[in-house]
Amino acid sequence: MEKYENLGLVGEGSYGMVMKCRNKDSGRIVAIKKFLESDDDKMVKKIAMREIKLLKQLRHENLVNLLEVCKKKKRWYLVFEFVDHTILDDLKLFPNGLDYQVVQKYLFQIINGIGFCHSHNIIHRDIKPENILVSQSGVVKLCDFGFARTLAAPGEVYTDYVATRWYRAPELLVGDVKYGKAVDIWAIGCLVIEMLMGQPLFPGESDIDQLHHIMTCLGNLIPRHQELFYKNPVFAGVRLPEVKDAEAEPLESRYPKLPEAVISLAKKCLHIDPDKRPFCADLLRHDFFQMDGFAERFSQELQLKIEKDARNNSLPKKSQNRKKEKDDALGEERKTLVVQDTNADPKIKDSKVFKVKGSKIDVEKMEKGSRASNANCLHDNGTNHKGLASTSLRDCSNVNIDHSRNPGTAIPPLTHNLSAVAPGINAGMGTIPGVQNYRVDEKTKKYCNPFVKPNQPPPAGIYNMNVSTSVSGEKYLLQANKKRKEYPKADVRLPELNYNHLPELRALEGIARNSRLIKKENKCLSESRIPSLAAIDLHVSSVASHQGAGSPLSDDSEADLPRMEHQH
């Protein structure tokens, strides 16, 4: 495993975690499933060995591709091709459901993948939105085969089955140990309604609640399942509700806006009797796929998507070429953030520029948001990065950054709340929720000047008056400081010295005059380095006022004064 560089955590569950990694030699991005220590937990070992065994014999364009298997320090590591987008992500972005054409393309590939497994006598047993990956080109891939297994031989029973309740067939809920491929067909019926409507079809909170949801829509269980229910000790003391035909709410009544072909397909998959549910090949021949020549047309389109994914996965070994191709694919959404150094020396013509690139995890979140904007086109145009999304510090803790290539200052990722940006947007079928424009925000902050008065003053009030007074006062101080700094030294004027102190000059007037001179001189002390004479003049004047009018200055005092030039 030393040849892989860990780029971050994708997700974790009860039996291990999935990490995004890069092959150091080829540069290929992969997903590595890291199981818990299998030697200490027999269940973990059983699930790991089952998934390894099945995926080694299953190779299909609609199944996730297992690349490598290794064991290190009692842990199993499974290396898969990396696909970070799921149908669950689409449902979160579009809570009112996906576009009809998108559901057609997704479901066609889902049934293809499940049919391939069934043809090898393998049932998945855990079909749900989060276990269905979608590549950048729109190719669907089933994943998480930890609960999958081969069909039981005659007389053999299944055990240890645990999967998501909302997609469980009735035979699983009542504890039937002789189920088959029909459990995956049931999950397909639940999935098609959820993809179109955005909400789960049967969101039960417990097994008995799940059965109640099913029976109120589809009617009573078959006699065999009713018998198994009452024999199951889990349901001891509980009775099944008896639903009359008039009380049932069928799919066409619950979802009157859905097309007839959708209702027909869903009802076939959700038949209460598992023996009457169709096979995958029968579903692909349904009107839902055959109308308007969709199946034939999309089969050709799908081959192009698969070839595109194959080209994207075969990355060059040279890191420079790989980086160039990645930057070209990102386009405008990954522009370099330019920060100008406003404290640079004004003598330099060009201001300093610092280039800071977003973190790897940010780019991935941006990629998901962009892929959502192209969901109606089924990602035909690839992915342009952005949006949003929030990044945890834990995701970034394992990221190895090459500082020699990126010497710029690292900016921590920001967490944005999309619901606060566009709270009223209805992300229905094919609509896209609002995405915040970060450049607009940066532009607003950059040109926001707190000292510029608005064109129309706010209504008069005590708070507005205080704010305006403070702003105007600060503006005046800024202008005054600027004038003082720009005041030339050659224009500094010294107070005039009176060598002839007239005898009729009164003492009080002399003191007042010299006080004004001191104040004026103190203002000029910070701007001029020329020594001040005001203090000497004050001393002489005070002596003159005490000695009486007409007392001339002594020769020694005049000798201490610097020679001044008088302008007439």
Curated annotation (Swiss-Prot):
Subcellular location per UniProt equals: Cytoplasm; Nucleus
Q: What InterPro entries does this protein's entry cite?
A: CDK, Kinase-like_dom_sf, Prot_kinase_dom, Protein_kinase_ATP_BS, Ser/Thr_kinase_AS
Keywords tagged on the record: ATP-binding, Cytoplasm, Kinase, Nucleotide-binding, Nucleus, Serine/threonine-protein kinase, Transferase
Q: Where is this motif: [NKR]KIAxRE?
A: 45-51
Q: What is stated about domains?
A: The [NKR]KIAxRE motif seems to be a cyclin-binding region.
Family annotation (PROSITE patterns): PROTEIN_KINASE_ATP, PROTEIN_KINASE_DOM, PROTEIN_KINASE_ST
**What name appears for this protein in its UniProt entry?**
Cyclin-dependent kinase-like 2
User: Which Pfam family would be a valid example here?
Assistant: Pkinase
Please name the SUPFAM superfamilies in this protein's record: Protein kinase-like (PK-like)
Q: What class of enzyme is it?
A: transferase
Task: Please report which protein family the annotation says this sequence is part of.
Answer: Belongs to the protein kinase superfamily. CMGC Ser/Thr protein kinase family. CDC2/CDKX subfamily.
Signal peptide start-end = none
In terms of one coarse class, where is the protein primarily found? cytoplasm
Q: Top-down, what is the taxonomic lineage of the species of origin? A: Eukaryota, Metazoa, Chordata, Craniata, Vertebrata
* Residue stretches of biased makeup (Basic and acidic residues): 322-333
Q: Record's Gene Ontology CC terms?
A: centrosome; cytoplasm; nucleoplasm
- Please name the CDD domains in this protein's record: STKc_CDKL2_3
Limits of the Protein kinase domain: 4-289
Instruction: Tell me which species this is from.
Output: Mus musculus (Mouse)
Chain segments annotated as transmembrane: none
Residues annotated as catalytic: 126 (proton acceptor)
Q: Quickly give the catalysed reaction.
A: L-seryl-[protein] + ATP = O-phospho-L-seryl-[protein] + ADP + H(+); L-threonyl-[protein] + ATP = O-phospho-L-threonyl-[protein] + ADP + H(+)
Task: Name the gene.
Answer: Cdkl2
> Where is it made, tissue-wise?
Expressed in testis, kidney, lung and brain.
Per UniProt, where does ATP bind? 10-18, 33
| Known EC number | 2.7.11.22
Chain spans, region Disordered = 309-333, 545-568
Alphabetically, the GO molecular function entries are: ATP binding; cyclin-dependent protein serine/threonine kinase activity; protein serine kinase activity
**Recorded superkingdom:** Eukaryota
